[in-house]
């Protein structure tokens, strides 16, 4: 997942520091999971990821559950999110609209709020197709 504040580019240097005290009896805790770049980089059997944003947490939970039963993202993540859908979900979230949960699951709100947002930042604007670079950020998020 592309996520604002990603530590992915620092992992080569961070990993030795973060794993220095892991001895097989303790647990690695990623206290700021976000895009899960840290926890996915650490090769260690006992790991816990903590995410404060309930929608991002729900998205990771959905990914985990589906991966355990062999359901690939192509089968459950929407192929596209239109600007209209993005704006509807964003406005519902901002206005704390209870009706939003009737239309969308928490994981869907998490997906749209991060994966379909510019730079992966929480509802930072619709990640539209970039004609100049020929990048489809919505399609990339799904893959």
Q: Which role fits each region the language model picked out?
A:
Residues 1-33, 37-38, 42:
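S-adenosyl-L-methionine
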Residues 45-143:
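Class I S-adenosyl-L-methionine-dependent methyltransferase module
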């Amino acid at each position: 997942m592309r996520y604002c504040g990603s530590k992915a580019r620092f992992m080569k240097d961070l990993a030795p520091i973060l794993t220095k005290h892991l001895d097989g009896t303790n647990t690695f805790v990623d206290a700021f999971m976000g895009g899960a770049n840290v926890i996915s980089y650490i090769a260690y059997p006992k790991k816990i990821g903590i995410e404060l944003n309930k929608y991002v947490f729900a998205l990771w939970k959905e990914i985990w559950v589906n991966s355990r039963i062999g359901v690939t993202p192509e089968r459950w993540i929407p192929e596209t999110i239109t600007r209209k859908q993005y704006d509807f979900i964003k406005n519902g979230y901002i206005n704390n609209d209870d009706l939003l949960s009737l239309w969308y699951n928490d994981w869907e709100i998490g997906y749209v709020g991060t994966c379909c947002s510019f730079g992966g930042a929480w509802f930072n604007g619709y990640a539209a197709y970039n004609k100049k670079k020929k990048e489809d950020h919505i399609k990339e998020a799904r893959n």
